[in-house]
């Protein structure tokens, strides 16, 4: 969806100067993202950081407190040089209601704490449809990418509009 985002930004505003840098690493956790963030911020000096991490923390059953702390720190670092937008994810129900709800609540809690925009669920509209996932049932297919972008776009568009003011 990130490559599609580049095209949508260009189509949306012919005069835009937005440069999209995809610094994601498949399988990364919030710890990995946080470890790399300072160098990325120094190198690219972004106006807006979109933080979409945590799924692998949850799938591995890692500490939710640590995940929350790392997301908070990433938002703090991003906001120190620009703005941030948080992208939430949900876990499959087999992780138990208590853990999955606590996991999902982290995103809204962090967004509220820092007064930043939130995309509540990246996979909204596709999460329960096998046709949109690879064999592992974790990674979306190419067919899912436009839908994912559509999930992010309304929040991102408003955020970019506010940054342009």
Where is each model-derived feature located?
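A short beta-strand-loop structural module common to alpha/beta enzyme folds
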Residues: 14-29
């Amino acid at each position: 969806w990130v490559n599609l985002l580049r095209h949508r930004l260009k189509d949306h505003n012919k005069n835009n100067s937005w440069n999209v840098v995809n610094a994601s690493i498949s399988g990364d956790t919030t710890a990995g993202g946080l470890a790399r963030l300072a160098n990325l911020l120094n190198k690219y000096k972004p106006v807006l950081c979109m933080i979409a991490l945590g799924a692998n923390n949850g799938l591995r059953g890692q500490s939710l407190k640590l995940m929350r702390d790392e997301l908070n720190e990433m938002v703090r670092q991003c906001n120190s040089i620009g703005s941030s937008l948080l992208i939430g994810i949900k876990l499959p129900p087999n992780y138990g209601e208590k853990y999955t709800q606590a996991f999902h609540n982290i995103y809204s809690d962090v967004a509220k704490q820092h007064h930043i925009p939130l995309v509540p669920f990246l996979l909204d509209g596709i999460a329960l449809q096998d046709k949109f996932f690879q064999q592992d049932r974790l990674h979306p297919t190419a067919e899912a990418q436009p839908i994912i972008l559509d999930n992010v776009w309304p929040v991102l568009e408003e955020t970019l509009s506010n940054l342009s003011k």
